[in-house]
């Protein structure tokens, strides 16, 4: 999680591919040299020129582009740049929980139109803004995503390694 591990060296995409990496989350909780984060400062106004090369190399090597944590402009830029479907490995619905990390309905529709998948996260702060998140909240996000995108474009991305979990 976070393309910062590429260390601004495009050859590291191949390095990681050769070691079995199947997807790279382009950014995390802040802008990096690849793209702007949902919690960033809009450093590049979306995907940077280096980020465009990274996405193209990921496509060439069969590594999935993951836009969880990406800012909205980064999301649409990556969707335009990528020649393969992208994923959002742990992103919920902004219509149900209004935080910048979650996907708008328009983003969900655009992702589905390009063959991508949005995985609803079980991280409590992205399921509800107040109170304790429950499995019912997670199901509501899944049902909403299915209604917007169709079931073929919806998955579950628990984020258990990033403090995910509901009661």
List the predicted regions and their residue ranges.
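Short acidic/histidine-rich active-site segments
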Residues: 121-122, 149-167
């Amino acid at each position: 999680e976070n393309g910062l591990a590429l260390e601004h060296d495009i050859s590291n995409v191949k390095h990681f591919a050769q070691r079995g990496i199947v997807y790279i989350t382009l950014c995390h909780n802040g802008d990096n040299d690849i793209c702007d984060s949902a919690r960033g400062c809009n450093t590049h106004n979306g995907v940077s020129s280096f980020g465009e090369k990274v996405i193209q190399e990921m496509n060439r090597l069969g590594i999935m582009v993951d836009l969880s944590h990406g800012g909205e402009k980064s999301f649409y830029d990556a969707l335009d740049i990528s020649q393969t479907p992208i994923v959002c490995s742990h992103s919920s619905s902004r219509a149900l929980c209004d935080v910048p990390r979650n996907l708008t309905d328009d983003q969900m529709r655009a992702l589905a139109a390009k063959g991508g998948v949005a995985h609803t996260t079980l991280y409590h702060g992205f399921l509800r803004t107040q109170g304790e998140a429950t499995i019912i909240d997670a199901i509501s996000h899944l049902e909403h995503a299915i209604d917007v995108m169709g079931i073929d474009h919806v998955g579950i991305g628990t984020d258990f390694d990033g403090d995910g979990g509901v009661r």
